[in-house]
Structure formats: C-alpha cells, structure tokens
UniProtKB/Swiss-Prot annotation:
Gene3D superfamilies: 3.40.50.12280. The gene is nuoB. This is NADH-quinone oxidoreductase subunit B. It comes from Deinococcus geothermalis (strain DSM 11300 / CIP 105573 / AG-3a). Binds 1 [4Fe-4S] cluster. Transmembrane segments: none annotated. Its main location: membrane. It is a peripheral membrane protein. One of its GO terms (molecular function) is 4 iron, 4 sulfur cluster binding.
C-alpha cells in the first residue's frame, strides 16, 4: 500500500485492518513502564524480601524489572527497603539525585513508610521527607508479591504521565546533615 493511499483512507477502516494508532507520548510511556530498572537501597530486613522478589518463584523480571542496578546512573526506580537513619538520609538523597530523569521511588515496608517500630530521634519517620515517594508498600516485612504489585502500580502510573512530568526537585533538607 502506498503512503498516499494510506493517508487518504479513513482511520476507522485502517484500524479494522490491524493498523495501530497512537501518540508518540503513549508509546514512550508504554516503553518506559515496561522497562523499569530498579536501584537497590536495602537498609534492613525488607531488603531480604526485595532480593527474593527476583528468584524463580516470584520472578520480577516478568514485569520489566530485569536486573537490579548497583549504579544509580543506570536506574530509574529506587526501592527503599527498611528503616532510614538520619545519618543515611543525605546519602540516599545523593543517590536519588544521581539517577537520571525520569525517576521514581518505591517505599517498601513499615519502617521506610512510617519509621516502623523505631520511633526515636535517629530514624527518619517517613522516606517521603527526603525524596518524593510514588508507591508505598505496607508490611513488616512485605512479601515479595506485595513488591511485585507495587511495581505493577508504578507501571500504571508511568503510563499515565507525560514525558517531562518528573522534572521537579525537592530541596535538600539541612536538618538531616547535622
């Protein structure tokens, strides 16, 4: 079929013949959502459950998160698993800032989401005070299936975002560096 003939035909007629119509933005969002590369930021017992989400039984790679990246420059999803001490908060922020845009954060476990049972001066009570969190995973520790569900929810969120929607920056909180 010549290109001129293709443009002269009605789009509904072409759609019935199996021609796909979409915007480039939707196509890019679909590609990004199905190729999330997580960076591990395991801080406590939740990290063990995060690691078991990639074993043969759970197989997180079925959902596009193939390999955990050791370098933040190669990752676009940070999974914060466990409690975050105030001494570790600036380091986590630095790792987050080194990740290329667009980037997302999953807060895994009760300790990362609310401080958990560690209600004291040395623990950040919510990772959201340091980096913007996109998905919270409840549990102590959450099961690997819960993390896989969180990745699937993040994929839905990524599909609905515009290409440059994640460019905002939170200021570094000086209270964590004291």
């Amino acid at each position: 079929m010549a290109l001129k003939e293709l443009f002269d035909r009605d789009w509904q007629e072409l759609e019935s013949e199996g021609v796909l119509f979409s915007t480039l933005e939707k196509l890019v969002a679909w590609g990004r959502s199905n190729s999330l590369w997580p960076a591990t930021f395991g801080l406590a017992c939740c990290a063990i459950e995060m690691m078991s989400s990639t074993d043969g039984r759970n197989d997180l790679s079925r959902f596009g998160s193939e390999v955990f990246r050791a370098s933040p420059r190669q990752a676009d999803v940070m999974i914060v698993a466990g409690r975050l001490s105030k001494k570790m908060a600036p380091i986590m922020r630095r790792v987050y800032d080194q990740m290329p845009d667009p980037k997302w954060v999953i807060s895994m476990g009760a300790c990362a989401s609310s401080g958990g049972m560690f209600n004291n001066y040395a623990v950040v009570q919510n990772v959201d005070h340091v980096v913007p969190v996109d998905v919270f995973v409840p549990g102590c520790p959450p099961r690997p299936e819960a993390l896989i569900y969180a990745v699937m929810q993040l994929q839905k969120k990524v599909r609905g975002e515009a290409y440059d929607a994640r460019g905002e920056q939170l200021p570094m909180v000086e209270a964590w560096t004291r």
